[in-house]
Each structure stands twice: as structure tokens, then as C-alpha cells.
Amino acid sequence: MKKYINDRLYDTDTAFEIDTYENRYYDFDCRYIKETLYQKQNGEFFLFGQGGSWTKYRQPRKRGGFCGSAVIVPLSIDNAKEWVKEHLSPEVYILTFGFIV
């Protein structure tokens, strides 16, 4: 997926894929969430997030209700660190950011 946000290009095909988090629901469930953390060549981080109609990724439908969607969310380095701490293993954190001091 490619998307321009604030005059910056975010591209999942050219960025480095760090790791992926999925919640416990099946991918056809309206509560399903899948988020992948990427790092661009310039060091910026972003999430490619997708989810069902009962998640933070939902989008309104034209005729009412909601549907699932996929979006790109730019992250500061501090937000990326917090996301990794919350969703991934300590090993991924160390490989990505180094040891916690």
C-alpha cells in the first residue's frame, strides 16, 4: 500500500517490515486487527493497520453502518517504541531499538 500523508510517502513495498501483531480473532471476524510495523529508509516508522467493522480501523458505509478497512499511520520513534513494547517481544524491541537503558 502507498499513501501520501503530510507530503511524505509511506510505501509498504519499499519499507523494511519489522514485525506483525494480530489479535486473537479470525481474519473474517468483525473484531479482527492486524498491524505491521515498518521502517522507511530514512528511519521513519509507520503502521499498516487493518481491521474489521468493530475496530478502530472501521469506516462508515454510505448506507449506514461500518465496514473494515486498512490504513497507514505514521509513528514517532517514541510511539513506535511504545507500540513494540505493547504488542511484540522484548527481542524485537532490542533488535529494532537496542537495549532499554
Mark where each language-model region is:
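Secondary-structure transition motif
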Residues: 1-101
